[in-house]
Regions:
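PRPP-associated nucleotide enzymes
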Residues: 1-181
């Protein structure tokens, strides 16, 4: 059985993702020209977007990676506590940080992470997400760069998973409810 059989419908095609990443890369390149840009990928979900975005950015930049988890709630909710599982390797002092995310959902994790990163004395901290789900927002946080707004459905592909599967789908699709019910 193919992974595609578990998908109810495709929300964002592979072609649309490629075009949007190129557009975001061009915008980021213009906005950060002459600055000390660091792309910070929040793993694991943003790995596919990060790989594509960094190649679409036409100016010199550094990359770094973090693994964070929200905990204290059930597996579908969060209490807003953020634990850093893997911290950045580099120093952020004087750098312009762009957090690269797969999806901005409730915003709770990023609303805690952004102030933590700002304590490291960067010039700036901004957010770039390929998917935004504003209907689920619980924290007062918005992306500075956004790919696509998506409805409140269970989306997978292009780095997003269910039970560590589907990340390698080249598009963003809605998972059939019977798969995760």
């Amino acid at each position: 059985m193919s992974m595609n059989d578990d998908i109810k419908n495709i929300l964002v095609s592979e072609e649309a993702l490629k075009a949007k990443v190129a557009e975001l890369g061009a915008q980021i390149s213009r906005d950060y020209e002459g600055r000390n840009l660091v792309l910070v990928s929040i793993l694991k979900g943003s790995v596919v977007f990060m790989a594509d975005l960094m190649r679409a950015v036409a100016i010199p930049c550094n990359i770094d990676f973090m693994v964070v988890s929200s905990y204290g709630g059930s597996n579908t909710t969060t209490s807003g506590l953020v634990k850093i599982i893997k911290d950045l390797d580099g120093d952020l002092s004087g750098k312009d940080v762009l957090i690269v995310e797969d999806i901005l959902d409730t915003g709770v994790t990023l609303s805690k992470l952004v102030p933590m990163l700002k304590m490291r004395n960067p010039n700036s901290v901004k957010i770039c997400t390929i998917l935004d789900k504003p209907s689920r927002r619980k924290a007062d946080i918005q992306p500075d760069y956004e790919g696509f707004q998506v409805p409140d459905e269970f989306v997978v592909g292009y780095g997003l998973d269910y039970d560590e599967k589907y990340r390698n789908l080249p598009y963003v699709g809605v998972l059939k409810p019977e798969i995760y019910a």
